[in-house]
Amino acid sequence: MTLREYILHWQEVYDKNQSRPTTYAAHGYLFKNHIIHRLGEIPLEELTVEQVGNFLDERRRFGGHRPESPEYPGLGEHTMRHIHRLLQQCLDQAIRDGLI
């Protein structure tokens, strides 16, 4: 199962029932535009701490832009905290589900 597949499962089973509609929509935006875009095709059992760390560092430095475009600012601390927390919640549940 890829991270993208698990994220879609997690959103439907856990997030949708535990979050307000606006929060659920915001999570969907962050997943779609940041997390799935870069990490989604990695199988859960192959996802490493280094890959997640590199992803977070890239987002912090370059935002949604390519590293070749340094003129664009990175994401703000508030957005980075949301991305980190959301990915952590999802992966923590994957561990509880016995998938990692």
Each language-model region and where it sits:
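N-terminal core-binding DNA-recognition domain of tyrosine recombinases/integrases
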Residues: 8-21, 32-100
